[in-house]
Structures are given as structure tokens and as C-alpha cells.
Amino acid sequence: AMEALKGTKRESTTFGKVDVVVYPGVMLVNNVTYKLYKAAFELQPAVEMQLWKGASLRLQVCLPIVNNEPGKWDCIRLGYLTLRQEFRLDNHWKGYLTGGNFSDDRQGLAAGIGYFSSDGRWTVEGEGGITGSSHLYGNDWGMSKWKRVNGQLSVGYFIPQVNTQLKVSGGRFIYGDYGVCGILSRYFGEYVVGLYGMYTDGETNAGFHFSIPLPGKKRSRHAVRVMLPDYFAFQYDMRSGNEFARRALGVSYRTEPKSAENSRFWQPDYIRYCLIRTNEKTKLK
């Protein structure tokens, strides 16, 4: 498909055009004994800009709306503050390099590379980074040296008959523990639901995740657009027992919002399935 596009005349470009994306943020955790749940809801607007080919800039701030947990959730603070470069090495290889302020109060450098089979069903991916802590609560911005090294290797397979993706990964988390994780994700059109399980340093964890499409995908390309993200994604961690949380096991970070990752799900069998479904619905009208 990429070869067929070579030499095609460019109709428009996203260079220099700005998106103001208003991400909803939800926190729901039950790893404390003094209340049933820690919960928070906030808006996380981000200024996003496409630079040169494969490069993007994201500047995000987190605005608290309501919560039942004092501390960071009461403060206006930085979200993602990143410069990201994506690249394609060959038809089957792609990767990224990014630096800046990530999720989970981390900042540093991270990189990843992945191999994708010809039919897109098999994937082998590796990623890692070196980070330090980054806390900006009110007027106090605390940072530490970049000394925490993490990395993981994952293998995934997409089962087209049931539109399900299986992924198994293993590696080193932020605070030095090693573990493995298995994820099962089922796709229903643009909706995704899934389960995961993790084992690290003698402790277990599990949970579920889902992703739902948000309205407003049909947009005109103006110099500045204000919009919602394409998807709202959420993951709930069970964290069995207090030991998992006390020892900060299985802690990782994201270099971009989860909904941004969902927007790039390009598995060929799944795209074909969605196109066939769309065509069938059109014929019935």
C-alpha cells in the first residue's frame, strides 16, 4: 500500500497546524484501607502539533475538577510535555524516540522498535527508557536524576476470526522488579474491552481495560482545531493485597495518552472487517 502512494501529489499538509485536544482524565484506585476508593476526574487539555515528517509536539496541562484525594489531584500540574519522532525502517519495521515529561510523574528519554509480519497478525516489539521523577504540584516542581532504567519485550498475535489480540510481555519495571504480563483485547467495531494479568517479584496483579469512541471525528482541517480525542481509554488495576502497592511493583509509564495509541491500531484483518461491515450497512440504507 505504501509503494502505491509513491509519487502521489500532496493535497494538504498538517505541518504548522495546531490541535487543542481536551482529554478526560479518570482515576479510580482501591489500594488503601482508609476509604473504599480513591477517585478523581479532571480535564487534560493538550496542544498538539505535527512538525516535520514523523515528528510531533505535545504540551499538556491537568486541570482538577472533582476528587476525594488531597495532594496532586488538587493541583494544576503538567501532563505530557514531549517531543516525539516516529520512523519506518522498512515495510515491516517501525519505531519511535521521545523525550520529555511522561505519565506517572516521570520524565526522561524513551525509545521503541517493532516488527510486524506481512499480514499484520504477528508483532514483536521492544521498548525502554531512562527516567527520573517529575512532580509539579502548585508552585513546587521537584525533579530527580535520570537513573531508573526500564524495558520490555512483547510478542502479540491478532486472531481475525474473533477480532481478538493476545499479547505477552516481560521485562524490567521502573523500580527494578522484573515480571511478565498477559493481555487479551477483544474488538467490537471501534469499541475495545480486555483483561490482563501480571506476575512480578512474587506478587500478582490483574485488571481490565476498555476503550470507547468519542463523538466529533468528522472535522475540517483548520489552522487551529479544538476537539475531543478519538477515544476514551481506561484501565482498572485490581492490585491484590497492599503489598503490591506498598512496594510499587509493576510500575510503568506512558509516553503518550492511551487514546492516541488506539487511534493508530491499523491491523489489516480488522480494517478489512470494518470496511465490509460498513459497506453492508450502506447497502441496507
Residue ranges and their predicted role:
Residues 10-19, 52-58, 88-94, 118-124, ...:
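Short loop/turn motifs that connect adjacent beta-strands in outer-membrane beta-barrel proteins
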Residues 31-40, 51-53, 65-78, 99-109, ...:
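Solvent-exposed loop/turn segments connecting transmembrane beta-strands
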Residues 1-83, 144, 277-285:
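Outer-membrane beta-barrel initiation region
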Residues 1-9, 123, 143-144, 150, ...:
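Flexible, glycine-rich linker and terminal segments associated
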